[in-house]
Amino acid sequence: MGQKINPLGFRLGTTQSHHSVWFAQPKNYSGGLQEDKKIKDCIKNYVQKNRKISSGVEGIARIKIKKRIDLIQVIIYMGFPKFLEGNPQGIEELQSNIQKEFNSVNQKLNIAITRIAKPYGQPNILAEFIAGQLKNRVSFRKAMKKAIELTEQADTKGIQIQIAGRIDGKEIARVEWIREGRVPLQTIRAKIDYCSYTVRTIYGALGIKIWIFAGEE
């Protein structure tokens, strides 16, 4: 059996960089990790509550957290940041929500929103799109093909999508996948973006995995 390594961890230091940039003493490290998770959960919950119901996609590609002694800087990379862009009240509300989670008085919090030019070239946004389709009982093949069409508009070199679970409500769980273009997982210099996403449907949980090949360094 082939041993499948996480494509992001495999490429750290070459084509991938860390999403959390900070140092901590070994005894404080676990606290820092929990802090990061709280920040990310808080942002995702806020976006979920405030986004327009029609779009169905949160549009968060990734969240980068940089910490200094006196400052926590959070950069949110979004595909569709309409309700936060040009809305200082929204960002202030989000900031106060995050600060409620922490009791550190001496650290200032700074939130920045960065818009992504081609949102459907990001696996997280694509996985949310597929999840929305599956929840609306669209057939999985149709959802996969539509997702591939969207990535082709984003100038990607290749994509692989895998869905596992009780697909279309069948009794027996199975794995279905589709690949378009090249996805060289063993080439370290290949820029590959990956995400795994769980979607809860009325039949049970489905796992979606997406690999996107953006080119070689």
From Swiss-Prot:
PANTHER family, A to Z: 30S/40S RIBOSOMAL PROTEIN S3 (PTHR11760), SMALL RIBOSOMAL SUBUNIT PROTEIN US3C (PTHR11760:SF19)
Domain of life, per lineage: Eukaryota
Disulfide bonds: none
Cellular component terms (Gene Ontology): chloroplast; cytosolic small ribosomal subunit
An individual GO BP term: translation
Keywords: Chloroplast, Plastid, Ribonucleoprotein, Ribosomal protein, RNA-binding, rRNA-binding
HAMAP family reported for this sequence: Ribosomal_uS3_B
NCBIfam families: rpsC_bact
Residues in KH type-2 domain copies: 43-117
Keyword check for Chloroplast: yes
Keyword Heme: no
InterPro entries: KH_dom-like_a/b, KH_sf_prok-type, Ribosomal_S3_C_sf, Ribosomal_uS3_bac-typ, Ribosomal_uS3_C, Ribosomal_uS3_CS
Cellular localization per UniProt: Plastid, Chloroplast
Similarity comment: Belongs to the universal ribosomal protein uS3 family.
CDD domains cross-referenced by the UniProt entry: KH-II_30S_S3
Protein name per Swiss-Prot or TrEMBL: Small ribosomal subunit protein uS3c
Alphabetized GO MF terms: rRNA binding; structural constituent of ribosome
